[in-house]
Curated annotation (Swiss-Prot):
The gene is rplC. Signal peptide: none annotated. InterPro entries: Ribosomal_uL3, Ribosomal_uL3_bac/org-type, Transl_B-barrel_sf. One of the primary rRNA binding proteins, it binds directly near the 3'-end of the 23S rRNA, where it nucleates assembly of the 50S subunit. This is Large ribosomal subunit protein uL3. Disulfide bonds: none annotated. GO terms for biological process: translation. GO terms for molecular function: rRNA binding; structural constituent of ribosome. GO terms for cellular component: cytosolic large ribosomal subunit. It comes from Vesicomyosocius okutanii subsp. Calyptogena okutanii (strain HA).
Amino acid sequence: MAIDLVGQKIGMTRLISDDGSIMPVSVIKIEPNRIVQTRTIDIDGYRAIQVTTGKKVNKKGEAKVRRISAAIKGHYAKASQEIGLGLWEFKLEDNEITNATSIDISLFGAGHYVDVIGKSKGKGFQGGVKLHNFQMQDATHGNSISHRAIGSTGQCQEPGRVFKGKKMAGHMGNKQVTQECLKVVKVDIEKSVILVKGSIPGAIKGFVKVSLSPKKDNSNKEVSKNIKNQVTNEVDQTKQM
């Protein structure tokens, strides 16, 4: 199971290659994910890490902790971590290392393929034509008012009802969407930003989860630093302190 990182969608831009071709890319800012809690099989029954990212600050850059409950403050204090913008939990395999204090963007490298999970933009209540791509009814020929109506949904006397799961008008968007196998075009470790080819789900400043795609072979790609080495180095530094 790949280790996920939490980032924020900054927007989209384009890269122009030497031959003049244009590539649309999405910009994801991934600040270091600080580990707040490590769940173990002995205590919790499964292995996982709970991470946070960013800092809660006001417009002046001061820490914004007024509306945070004492329980959450104590949860962060127990891990000696600053209060972040949220908490996310990722399950781990038995052979994955969890003795780190944080995981950063060096997990990814140019040429890697990643999966991005985000929440799609909410479109509100929409009809069947927009939500499910239903065909519209006649614009004329005696049709009045019901141009965009979905039409008949039930049967006659038998069964005389509408089956569950029938596509109808309803809320559109605001659901979890996974975009698979997106190629990492560029990694900027200093700015904590990665560029991936194509679009990703969600609105600007929305949180997304990024992980190496299990459907692609990422083992032979060049990376800035292996995640295992990163974790080991942090553990060694902690012991020296």
